[in-house]
Amino acid sequence: MNITRILSQELSATTVQINAAIELLDDGATVPFIARYRKEATGGLDDTQLRQLAERLQYLRELEERKAVVLKSIEEQGKLSDDLRAQIEAADNKTALEDLYLPYKPKRRTKAQIAHEHGLQPLADVLLAEQPQDVEAAAQGYLNENIPDAKAALDGARAILMEQFAEDAELIGTLRDKLWNEAEIHTQVVEGKETEGEKFSDYFDRREPVRAMPSHRALAVLRGRNEGVLNIALKYQPDDTPITQQSEYEQIIARRFKVSDGHKWLRDTVRLTWRAKIFLSLELEALNRLKEAADTDAITVFARNLKDLLLAAPAGRLTTLGLDPGYRNGVKCAVVDDTGKLLDTVIVYLHQENNMLATLSRLIKQHGVKLIAIGNGTASRETDKIAGELVRGMPESSLHKIVVSEAGASIYSASELAAREFPDLDVSLRGAVSIARRLQDPLAELVKIDPKSIGVGQYQHDVNQSRLAKSLDAVVEDCVNAVGVDANTASAPLLARISGLNQTLAQNIVAYRDENGAFDSRKKLLKVPRLGEKTFEQAAGFLRINGGKEPLDASAVHPEAYPVVAKMLAQQGITAAELIGNRERVKQIKASDFTDERFGLPTILDILSELEKPGRDPRGAFQTASFAEGIHEISDLQVGMILEGVVSNVANFGAFVDIGVHQDGLVHISALSNKFVQDPREVVKAGDVVKVKVLEVDAARKRIALTMRLDDEPGGAKHKMPSENRSRERTAGRKPQRNDRAPTNSAMADAFAKLKR
């Protein structure tokens, strides 16, 4: 198996690109470094392609290692033929490899092995090859002290044949593909669980093709099964099929081993093999495959949403008051300055409104607060209302209030990191600090929190947690390096995400900075303990030194490329300070004049872009949503209302929008636009501010159906999805006929409602 060629085909890249990327990865280079500073070597592979390459490379190398183990095992048994070796070496996935290994894999003594030891292999061979009608007569010649009668002999022969049938790799592959492509997954409510499992009512009696089941439905029904509410079964033929009727799968097995239609004993053996052995194994395998595919989709959704939140526009360096709302325990308040340094804290109470207004007004005036960040949890709307009174009562202060997600703030508050950062601050007040800081700079603050706690994932608790963690770590790393960090102000958790660095090196940088003062150049980073040349190469381009000796240190230009900039300056006859940020002078430089064997055109163009806008931030402009006054709870909503909200989560089937009622509403993919939408992310992303219309409210089930097509009328003629979306929905799943109707957005809201633990 040629790994390079396989990766080349999968990524639509040349073998030269693939080999270069593999060499860099094997040499310890990080994905952000390769994507940014080694474009010539990889032909411009981006971070997404490099992540895919790294993941597939690991899989294929594990496959090769497993092949070596399998070949050695079979060879030691003396059963490795040239043909089998060729099949094993040609296997392109782990499932196919294990199918080939199954007949030779060491296993506990089976009925077939015992029968073989008792001399029944020849009987099994005769029964299959000659297919005598009188099988009992054929068995008489194989009786011995271990086989007292014909029945025992035939039972042993059957065990041998069943194992032989079930371990035929080519046959199993055929049956597996057929089952996956044609079988339906049938979900039914467990008797007596109708009330307890009401949130799974969409799946109380549902059938749809297993291969077409969307990830959100797959994870929903699997959660229902895990909670003891749903039974799940794979159906390969109609329920009313007579039990004696031979299935297509049994016919395939019979044809494979040339079993005649009239031989009842062999036909029964085939039926038992399929129903008691092969199907049970393939059903479990299919459900695992469904789970893995659903995990992949859900993790992809979570990763994209996390990226959108991490790269949300920062409000900027403004003194901010963070409010962590609460009823009984009060509203926790924290003021941080424009650098995020804690200035003041206090706890106020909603039922003491006048005192709360006076206290917050004092804090705002005393510290020059410009922004109020309000957590969106319990008591958020009441807190927001009082903050609104403050803003209106202080027009001269240029004060603005913004409701922000407080997901993960409580987890951060109780973390070891928060304890080190604020050892003398009450745990309850640390969350208010986090809320204030995440408004100033979401990326810098959210990196301190386990990404799984940020709450932008589709069924994040149901998917494979190690795969999820690996994917999210990659997203955080890519986001931090895309923005870059100030080496003199960044926290250790933020520095730890920089290419080439880890927690230890990040702590060393902070410790060196605290002891020796601010870094005045990137070169000074080499004085940090354990930060060597290799690490410096990987990290330097992503670390900024503002106001240092070298102007380029504040840019994304890598130190290795400084000589190139020096040549540009010499050609133009100007200094770095005169060139950096001077768009007209940068435009006069011809990129091709500075290419050489080491630095190609892609790198030179990147350098020029950076010189034009040094340290440019890829994050967009800051914007906020204004929640409607008087809309606090789901019971306040009325069908037809047009509201402003914030996209909290984007899934494959639509987008969830926070409209300020403590329960996100769903805009189904069909209601995102008047045009056909293939992927919701073509229209929205997490953090976007959108206008929506309320189409349906189910307060009992906490479900809200919304549309971004503001001319839609609930239940009206306009309230239909584009024809392409209707077609896609019909092919995506099928319910029993009594439930089969043209879906509306409200029906889809029911079908795809967000399930929370």
Curated annotation (Swiss-Prot):
InterPro entries for the chain: HHH_9, NA-bd_OB-fold, Ribos_protein_bS1-like, RNaseH-like_sf, RuvA_2-like, S1_domain, S1_Tex, Tex-like_central_region
Residue span(s) of domain S1 motif: 640-709
UniProt GO BP: nucleobase-containing compound metabolic process; translation
PROSITE patterns documented for this protein: S1
Keyword NADP (UniProt): no
Chain intervals for the UniProt region annotation (Disordered): 710-757
UniProt KW Plastid keyword: no
GO-annotated cellular components: cytosol
Name listed for the protein in its UniProt record: Transcriptional accessory protein Tex
Biological source species: Neisseria gonorrhoeae
